[in-house]
């Protein structure tokens, strides 16, 4: 298998929806909004196996100081093959001159995974949100 990585946003709404649903992420249930968000954020990197979208990472940033990796996902058929690591490294290179690169690890196994990629837990912080759905 030869995986191709790109920063081109040449995926369809359906491809994004299918990838997000493959990992049971609620964003996949809102394909129009998801696609709009991915088309309008600052950075998107994708991973492809032929014409199949198998991985995606996106980030939003303030232009110079802080970037937030919002999505990082790999299709279950391809997890464990280094795709998430490569997408993360692409983000780290893209934002190497920023002071902060943040992400949210939503479960304990992900904390260890991201620590292995150079991220550190921030003591005394809590993720907070206003959810409309």
Q: How does the language model describe each region?
A:
Residues 1-29, 125-126:
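Short amphipathic alpha-helix that is part of the acyltransferase structural core
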Residues 11, 64, 108-109:
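Short alpha-helical
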Residues 35-46, 100:
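A short helix-loop-beta-strand connector motif used in the catalytic cores of GNAT acetyltransferases and
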Residues 46, 52-61, 68-73:
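Conserved beta-strand in the GNAT
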Residues 78, 82-87:
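Conserved acetyl-CoA pyrophosphate-binding loop and the N-cap/start of the following alpha-helix
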Residues 88, 93-106:
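Conserved GNAT acetyl-CoA-binding A-motif
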Residues 102-112, 129-133:
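Conserved beta-strand-loop-alpha-helix junction that forms the acyl-donor binding cleft
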Residues 117-124:
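Conserved acetyl-CoA-binding loop of GNAT-fold acetyltransferases
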């Amino acid at each position: 298998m030869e995986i191709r990585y790109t920063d081109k946003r040449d995926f369809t709404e359906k491809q994004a929806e299918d990838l997000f649903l493959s990992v049971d992420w609620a964003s996949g249930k809102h394909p129009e909004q998801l696609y709009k968000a991915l088309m309008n954020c600052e950075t998107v990197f994708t991973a492809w196996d032929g014409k199949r979208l198998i991985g995606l990472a996106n980030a939003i940033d303030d232009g110079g100081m802080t970037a937030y990796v919002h999505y990082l996902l790999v299709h279950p058929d391809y997890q464990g093959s280094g795709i998430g690591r490569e997408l993360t490294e692409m983000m780290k290179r893209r934002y190497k001159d920023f002071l902060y690169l943040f992400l949210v690890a939503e479960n304990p196994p992900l904390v260890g995974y991201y620590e292995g990629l150079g991220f550190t837990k921030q003591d005394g912080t809590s993720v907070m949100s206003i959810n409309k759905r």
